[in-house]
């Protein structure tokens, strides 16, 4: 399963939910909206 908004993530292995336009923040290491 992909990671939801605000969940901890790894920028080098981004598992945030792309269908929700989420990307892993390089700075904060959590999933945020990428727009």
Curated annotation (Swiss-Prot):
Negative results: has no effect on human and rat Nav1.8/SCN10A. Has no effect on voltage-gated potassium channel human Kv11.1/KCNH2/ERG at 10 uM. Belongs to the neurotoxin 10 (Hwtx-1) family. 10 (haplotoxin-1) subfamily. GO terms for cellular component: extracellular region. Keywords: Disulfide bond, Ion channel impairing toxin, Knottin, Neurotoxin, Secreted, Toxin, Voltage-gated sodium channel impairing toxin. It is found in: Secreted. The keyword Disulfide bond applies. Spider venom neurotoxin that blocks voltage-gated sodium channel Nav1.3/SCN3A in human (IC(50)=1 uM) and rat (IC(50)=1 uM). One of its GO terms (molecular function) is sodium channel regulator activity. This is Beta-theraphotoxin-Hlv1a. Disulfide bonds join 2-17, 9-24, 16-31.
């Amino acid at each position: 399963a992909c990671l939801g908004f605000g969940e901890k993530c790894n920028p080098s292995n981004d598992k945030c939910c792309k269908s929700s336009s989420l990307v892993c923040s390089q700075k904060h290491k959590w999933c945020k909206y990428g727009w």
